């Protein structure tokens, strides 16, 4: 995705690794930053150097759907999906992981999809890009169960693959 957009002169692509916090059992959090896992050719922008108000990005792509709901790790609240959504015309969520295709008849696997599907990043995003048609159907079904039958069309429209 980065290569596709960064070579197109119509786009200005900014890659901003977010600092994150490991949550301790006592409720405190330890600050951490991971900039070493990016290829050298990717120009990184520090979140301290970036202003959403000045940049007014057309699109923001996120990979972390959890916001404050992850029990072990979080980012600063200013980077939660609901806050990013107000700074862009289109918030796009692309899961950072690939999963096996899930058979809805496998109740254990289906049950645990709630841990990554019904999360704020998918809910607040204007567009969700799933890995396949089957995973899109899974997202639509799970989110419709969570929010009610009247929401099904919304999920069908905003989730793609």
In which residue ranges do the predicted regions lie?
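Active-site and donor-binding regions of nucleotide-sugar-utilizing enzymes
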Residues: 1-157, 161
């Amino acid at each position: 995705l980065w290569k596709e957009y960064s070579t197109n002169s119509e786009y200005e692509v900014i890659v901003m690794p977010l600092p994150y916090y490991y949550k301790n059992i006592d409720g405190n959090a330890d600050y951490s930053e991971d900039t070493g896992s990016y290829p050298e050719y990717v120009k990184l922008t520090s979140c301290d150097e970036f202003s959403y108000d000045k940049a007014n990005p057309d699109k923001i792509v996120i990979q972390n759907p959890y916001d404050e709901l992850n029990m072990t790790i979080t980012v600063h609240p200013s980077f939660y999906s609901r806050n990013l959504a107000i700074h862009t015309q289109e918030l796009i969520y692309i899961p950072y992981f690939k999963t096996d295709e899930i058979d809805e008849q496998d109740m254990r696997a289906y049950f645990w999809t709630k841990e990554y599907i019904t999360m704020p990043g998918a809910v607040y995003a204007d567009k969700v890009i799933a890995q396949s048609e089957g995973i899109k159907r899974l997202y639509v079904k799970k989110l419709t169960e969570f929010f009610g039958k009247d929401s099904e069309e919304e999920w069908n429209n905003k989730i793609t693959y």
